[in-house]
UniProtKB/Swiss-Prot annotation:
Gene Ontology, cellular component aspect: cytosol
Organism of derivation: Carboxydothermus hydrogenoformans (strain ATCC BAA-161 / DSM 6008 / Z-2901)
Keyword annotations of the record: RNA-binding, Transcription, Transcription antitermination, Transcription regulation
Function: Involved in transcription antitermination. Required for transcription of ribosomal RNA (rRNA) genes. Binds specifically to the boxA antiterminator sequence of the ribosomal RNA (rrn) operons.
Record-given protein name: Transcription antitermination protein NusB
GO biological process terms, semicolon-separated: DNA-templated transcription termination; transcription antitermination
CDD domains xref list: Terminator_NusB
Pfam families: NusB (PF01029)
Transcription regulation in keyword set: yes
Molecular function GO labels: RNA binding
Length: 144
C-alpha cells in the first residue's frame, strides 16, 4: 500500500461530503476496515495521511470551493461533476496546505484518479484548473 491508495480512499470518503458531511470520516474508517478485511494491513502512517486529507478538505472546503468557482470559468459550480469537484478539492488542499507534497505529484494523482472515476473530459478539466493554480501558486498561498 502507498499514498496513492490513501488518496483514493480519502477521495471515496470525500465524495459523499456534499451529501452527508457528518459521515465522511466514518466512511473513511469503513473503507480502511474493508482493506484490512481483505488482508491488506496498511501502515499507520498511510491511515493517518488519509485522515489528515479528509479532515483538511472538510476544514478548508469553503476556501477550496471558492478557488474552484473562480477557475471553472463558464461552468456553474453546482453543475460540476461531483467526482471532479471532489478531486479538485483534494488536490487543491494538498497544493495549498501540504508543502511536504510536491505540487506536480498532487496534480498527477488527481488526474490519474479522474481517469478512473471521472468522465472522459475530467482529466483535462482537472489538469487545466490545477495547472493554473500551480502557475500562480504564490497568489493562492497569500490568500489562504
Amino acid at each position: 500500500m502507498n499514498r496513492h491508495t490513501a488518496r483514493e480512499l480519502a477521495f471515496k470518503a470525500l465524495f459523499g461530503l456534499d451529501f452527508a458531511p457528518e459521515k465522511t470520516l466514518d466512511t473513511l474508517e469503513s473503507l480502511w476496515a474493508e482493506k484490512i478485511a481483505e488482508g491488506k494491513i496498511p501502515p499507520e502512517k498511510l491511515v493517518d495521511f488519509s485522515r489528515e486529507l479528509v479532515r483538511g478538505v472538510i476544514e478548508k472546503k469553503e476556501r477550496l470551493d471558492e478557488i474552484i468557482r473562480r477557475r471553472a470559468i463558464g461552468w456553474d459550480f453546482k453543475r460540476l461533476a461531483k467526482v471532479d469537484k471532489t478531486l479538485l478539492r483534494l488536490a487543491l488542499y494538498e497544493m495549498l496546505y501540504r508543502p511536504d507534497i510536491d505540487i506536480p505529484v498532487s496534480i498527477d494523482e488527481a488526474v490519474e484518479l479522474a481517469k478512473v472515476y471521472g468522465e472522459e473530459e475530467s482529466p483535462k478539466f482537472i489538469n487545466g484548473i490545477l495547472g493554473y493554480v500551480a502557475e500562480h501558486i504564490d497568489e493562492f498561498w497569500e490568500e489562504s
